[in-house]
Amino acid sequence: MDNNNNQRGISFIGSIALLVSAMTGPGLVTIPLLFQISGWLIPTVMFLVAMSLGAISSLLLCEALTTVRGNDHFQRKIELTHLTNFLIPQKKTRLIIQIILYLSIESVIIASIILSSQAMDLMLLRWAGKTCGLSLHPNLGFLCVKDAIDGNSPFGSSYMLASLGFVIALGFCAPLAFLDLVDNMIVQILSFGTLAFIVIVWIGTFIITGLHKDYVPLIGSNQSQVVGTVLFNYAFVTTVPSWVNDLRPDVSIRKATWYSVIITTLAYILLGILGGMTYKMDLASNIIAEIDHSSHRNILTDIATFLFPLAVLLTSIPVYSIVVRYNLERSGLCKRKMAILLSTLLPWIIVLPFQSGFWLNIFTNWTTLLFTSASNFIIPFYLYNLSQKQKNQISSIEIIELAEKDFETSTLIITSSSASATPPPSVPPSSPMLNADKIDKKTLPNVDTKNIIEKATNIISNTTDNDNLLHPNRSLHYRSNRSNENINDNLIITPTSPTTPISPISPISPTLPILPSSPQYPSTPSTTFSQTKSFIAFPASRQCRMMVAMVAGIISIILVGGIIIYDFIKLALGSNEFDLSANS
């Protein structure tokens, strides 16, 4: 039964489908315009930089997760918000970061709901000839439109309570959001296959239509949109902890991560360069609009246009809802019912009166700018740095414990040997040697070394004795990433008792947890667990990984800080434009 549970995890193909889905969205159709106005050199370089930052941030975050005591192989299912409880002792700082993480993912869900609802209404308008909804302002009542109005929504500036597109999106996403992440993998794999079909059809259409090199210069006249448009397409890092917690044992985290970002980057660059060379686009245009008005429109392009909102936009909403629920529930912030309310129902309620107009778009853009950027490209590097510092703090505790164990072992050997040896000659009752022991006991303090070590450990790690106990009804799933194979192996071990400690040291532990005296399965060698290693971001020394984390973190801060400053300057100058991708 345990083996079946292991195989129920997310597969390698499912991992790629999940991560690619998190990195692709409505921004996919606007990339050719970016290459036309900015040239192909700087956007291509920025895509490579963003790809590297996203992958490094994800892998370092995974390594930080394994430093939590008892989570060496992701067996405790520690989520991102839960990780802050272990690494950040300051309550105010921890609360601020948790709020940023929550608002980041919620803003992505809200933006995706808006874009998906609008896309469904436009699809109905295209294929059914009209779409309808319940209007709140300026006219209260049922409203139907037959022609698309300029803007993102077919209803223009009218404020809608609900539209047919919203109902379709809700009916598709809500049932999937109540499932677990593993149960959504079939939908994600189908979405990935559909996305591949769409990209192939578009590229084929570009080639048939004809390419014009002069449409995409080496360096364009406007570079202001490059960083924001490219960087936020890789804002998938917040989904990584939930993914690795449900990962199957035979899946390599490194390979899945790098394959996903490389596939996504190639799709963006190919669509950007080839699409930009095919059509001369204005600032309000995109790939779908240009193909629809081209002479090479055919049944395949119509199918691709029909499937795009379904495969690319809708399928990401349940994933982010599940990630929010996991973070709230697994970290103990709230119970399951409240977690479902906050993750699945609340975003749809917030969106109801704001499906059209511009106020929610402004809110979404700024929350994406401030929260999504920090949670994906700054906080992961910060948490990794904290995890490595905590490792240094507990090294002295490990040395003390090792010395204590050696002392106890040597004492046991001496006691055993003395018990089997010839007893010493008896001492008369009046001998002063008998009183010496009493004198020593009075003069020497009664020191309990083990209690001192435990108290010191709790002080350093900011934990209590209750944190050292494993839940009695929970099994441990050990996943290792061998440096020579890059493959994770899971084995299941049930604690010997409800009070079996996870680790003798702090919540952040680079060593393996205490294991039962014998494995659960007789066929498993007794040396399996002593030979497994915790996951590391990439095969390099710890100093090298910390250096990479520092450099990548500095680059991320410079890029994100530059975008924020740039947009604040634009706002001060009276501009309502934002240097952001449409894909949150």
Annotate each PLM feature.
Residues 32-67, 71-74:
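Extracellular loop-to-transmembrane helix junctions
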